[in-house]
Amino acid sequence: MFKKLTVLIMVCAMLFVFVCGCTQKTDEPTEYIGIISAMDNEIDLLLKEAEIDHVDTVADVKYYVGSLCGQPIIITRSGIGKIRAASGVTTMLNKYNISKVIFTGIAGGVADEAQVLDEVIATRLVEHDYGILSNDGFKWRSGDPGFGNEPGAYYECDPDLLQLAYDAAVDVLGEEHVFKGTVATGDQFIANSEYVQKLRSDYDAYACEMEGAAVAVVCLQYNTPFVVIRALSDKADGNAHESYENFGDVAADNSSRIVMKMLNAMGE
C-alpha cells in the first residue's frame, strides 16, 4: 500500500511539473509585427488578406490583431499627421509585444527620377517643418524636437528591415521603380513645386509625407526596429491633388503588396 501511494505521489508530481511547464510556454506573450498607416485605403488590402482574431479599440483607434502571410501582426490606421501617427504607434508599442514596425502608405514624390507609382524605401526621415519662424523667415533646426539637444537631424531606419523592404519592392515592382533615400515629414500636404525643390536641395529628399518621422522618433525611443515604405501617388506639385485622386488607391495597394512580400520573406 505504501509503495502504491509513493508511486501515485511521484506520478502526480511529474504531471504537475509537466502542466506547469506547458502553461508557462503558453503564457509567453506573442511577438507581433506592427503595421501602421495613416488612411483606410493604405490598409484595406492588408485587412482583406489577413486573418483577424479580434479588434481592440483604444481612443477611437482600432488595432486589428491576427496573422498575415503566416506572421502574427497588429494592423492600425492612426490617422493623418505627426500627432496621430505618434499616438497610434505609442499605443501599439505599449499595449502589445511588438518586435518591429512597418509604416506603409503613399507619399508625394520629390526626386526628379522618382515617378508616380514608384516606391521609395526610407533610409532615414527628417521633420522638414521643425524650426524657428521669425521676421527673417523660417529656419529649419536640426535635433530632436522636444528635448533641447541635437543628437542629429535624421532618424535612421533599421538596416535589415530596409534591405528586406527594398528586396520585396524590387520583386513586386521591378528595380527601375524602386528608390532608397530620405523621406521628409511635415504636417502639410505638399502641392507646391517651389517647396519640392527646397525639400530636394535642403534634405536630399526622395519623398514627402505627414507621418513617417513621428513614427521613427517613437520607435527609436522604444528601441524598436522600424522601416517606412511609401508609394508615390503624386509629385507634390501643382497637380498633386488630381494625381492623388487618380492614383492614391493603386499606390496604396502597391505598398501593401510589398508589406506582404516582406512578411512572406520573414517566414522563409
Regions found by a protein language model. Give the residues of each.
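Generic "edge-of-domain/loop-turn" microfeature
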Residues: 6, 16-19, 42, 73, ...
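Short, solvent-exposed secondary-structure boundary motifs
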Residues: 14, 52-58
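Glycine-rich phosphate- or other oxyanion-binding loops that anchor nucleotides, phosphorylated ligands
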Residues: 29-33, 57-268
